[in-house]
C-alpha cells in the first residue's frame, strides 16, 4: 500500500511538471495501521491570541486560514478546528527551511500536512477542497487534500508560509498546514467525511 501511495504521489508531481504549472499542492500522513482506541486524541489547540513563540505569527493569515478551513468543514457538518501554537511552530519551522525550489517534499512528522506553492492562502484551500468534487462518500479508497480538510476527528490546525521569489513567480507563497489528529486514516473515512449539507449550500 505504501509503495502504491508513493508511486501515486510521484505521478502527481510528474504531471504537474509536465503541465508546467507553478502552483502545486500535496498532502501527507496517510495512516495505514491504527488501533480504534487511538483515533480520538487530545486537542492541541490554544488559540491565535496571546502567541509568544519564537516565530512571527501573522494573525491576519492565521485567522483567514482557520476561518476558511472551518467554512469548508461546516459544509460537511464537521466539527470546527481550533488554532494550535504547537502546530504553528511545527509548520513555521518546516516552512522556514524550504529552499523555494517549487518541489514539494514533506516533513515526515507525526501530523497531517498539506502543502501548496504559488497559491494565495484562499486559493490553496480552494485547490485542496476542489479535489472532493468527484468524491464518493462512504468510500474507503480515496484519501486526499479534500478529505484532510473535512476530516471530522481532526480538531487542531496550524498554518505557516514563506514568501519565495522565483524566475516565474515573484513573491510566490509556500504554504504549510499541519493537522492534529491527522486525518486520512484508512478504513475510517465513512466515519469522518460527510456529504455536503444541502442546507448549507447557497
UniProtKB/Swiss-Prot annotation:
Subcellular locations according to the entry: Secreted
Alphabetical list of Gene3D superfamilies matching this protein: CAP
SCP domain: residues covered: 66-179
GO BP annotations, alphabetical order: sexual reproduction
Annotated transmembrane regions: none
Keyword Signal: yes
Database matches in InterPro entries: Allrgn_V5/Tpx1_CS, CAP_dom, CAP_sf, CRISP-related
Pfam families named in the record: CAP
Induction notes from the record: Expression is higher in white cells.
GO CC terms of this entry: extracellular space
Residues modified by glycosylation: 58, 152
SUPFAM superfamilies documented for this protein: PR-1-like (SSF55797)
Family, similarity comment: Belongs to the CRISP family.
Function text: Secreted protein that acts as a virulence factor during infections.
Name by which UniProt lists this protein: Probable pathogenesis-related protein CaO19.2336
Amino acid at each position: 500500500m505504501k509503495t502504491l501511495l508513493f508511486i501515486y504521489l510521484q505521478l502527481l508531481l510528474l504531471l504537474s511538471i509536465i503541465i508546467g504549472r507553478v502552483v502545486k499542492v500535496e498532502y501527507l500522513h496517510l495512516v495505514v495501521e491504527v488501533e480504534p482506541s487511538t483515533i480520538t486524541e487530545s486537542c492541541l489547540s490554544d488559540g491565535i491570541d496571546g502567541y509568544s513563540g519564537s516565530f512571527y505569527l501573522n494573525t491576519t493569515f492565521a485567522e483567514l486560514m482557520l476561518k476558511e478551513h472551518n467554512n469548508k468543514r461546516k459544509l460537511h457538518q464537521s466539527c470546527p478546528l481550533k488554532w494550535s501554537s504547537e502546530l504553528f511552530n511545527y509548520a513555521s519551522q518546516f516552512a522556514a527551511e524550504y529552499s523555494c525550489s517549487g518541489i514539494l517534499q514533506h516533513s515526515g512528522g507525526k501530523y497531517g500536512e498539506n502543502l501548496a506553492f504559488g497559491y494565495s492562502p484562499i486559493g490553496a484551500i480552494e485547490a485542496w477542497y476542489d479535489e472532493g468534487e468527484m468524491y464518493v462518500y462512504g468510500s474507503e479508497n480515496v484519501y486526499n487534500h479534500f478529505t484532510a480538510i473535512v476530516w471530522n476527528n481532526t480538531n487542531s490546525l496550524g498554518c505557516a508560509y514563506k514568501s519565495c521569489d522565483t524566475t516565474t513567480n515573484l513573491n510566490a507563497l509556500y504554504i504549510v498546514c499541519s493537522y492534529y489528529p491527522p486525518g486520512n486514516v484508512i478504513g475510517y473515512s465513512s466515519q469522518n467525511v460527510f456529504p455536503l449539507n444541502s442546507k448549507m449550500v447557497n
